[in-house]
Amino acid sequence: VLLSTTVIFNSSFWAQCDSIYTSFIILAILFLHKDKPIASFVFIGIAFAFKLQTVFIIPVLLYYWISTKKISILHFFIIPAVDVIMCLPAIIMGRPFIDIITIYAEQTDYGKLIQMNCPNFYALICDGNDITYYYLFKQFSVFLTIAVLGIMMCIIIYKKVDLKNLETFLLTTAWTVFTCIMFLSSMHERYGYLLDIILIVYAAVIAKHLWIPIVSTLISLRGYCYYLFSYELISLKFTAIIYTALY
């Protein structure tokens, strides 16, 4: 993981915080698989305090709840509770409590572009630099993502998918994060960080499909090179075709 180009460019070179929240999500996945849901949800809460994109993992928790019956719906309340606890230093120093609740809601309207150097579905169908497409597809992107995730929920229920199986669990987790990146609006190239790490973990633990994290990491590398160095070996649209095929 540490030698991945995604980690090197994102964390060491660009000094982004994606490694922090991703680390806690990986711990959450580990503890959930070990039937320690309280610890798992605590780690999700900590991750959420660092970055909003932790919500990409929430559907997996719902799938796990439906599939295994090993967690309670009450466990989900641990996430906001831990988030508030993590924000207590800011409150003690005088920041209004309402800011803790609204700060992420305000971020959802930041960066009014349908995609930002992210080779997802919208890079295939429109110009990401045209703000018109943001307003055209913003609401649609949310409904589309929910619909796709909802279809997976139906499949898990109908097929009785066993998420206690580690390989199935990791694949479902990767697919869920990939779905959010692929269909939500205003996705950055950096949002693929969590997906890359989960795929590397999957390849290392299961020792199958080693080419998948390699392709995903190379696609992320293309995004970092374009943003940081204005270097584009292949176009965003062609990269989006590869990314969609990988999905």
Language-model-detected regions and their locations in the chain:
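Aromatic/glycine/proline-enriched transmembrane-helix motif characteristic
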Residues: Q107-M182
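Membrane-interface alpha helices of multi-pass inner-membrane proteins
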Residues: I8-F9, L27-F31, I38-Y63, I85, ...
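Perimembrane helix-loop-helix junctions
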Residues: F56-A81, I92-M93, L194
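Transmembrane and membrane-interface helices of multi-pass
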Residues: V1-V7
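Specific aromatic-rich, kink-prone transmembrane helix
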Residues: I20-P37, I198-L199
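Aromatic-rich transmembrane-lumenal/periplasmic boundary elements in polytopic membrane proteins
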Residues: H75, P80-N120, L124
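Transmembrane helical bundles and short interhelical boundary loops of multi-pass, membrane-embedded
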Residues: I100-N117, T173, I206-Y247
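Short acidic/glycine- and proline-prone juxtamembrane loop motifs at membrane-interface regions
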Residues: S12-I20, H188
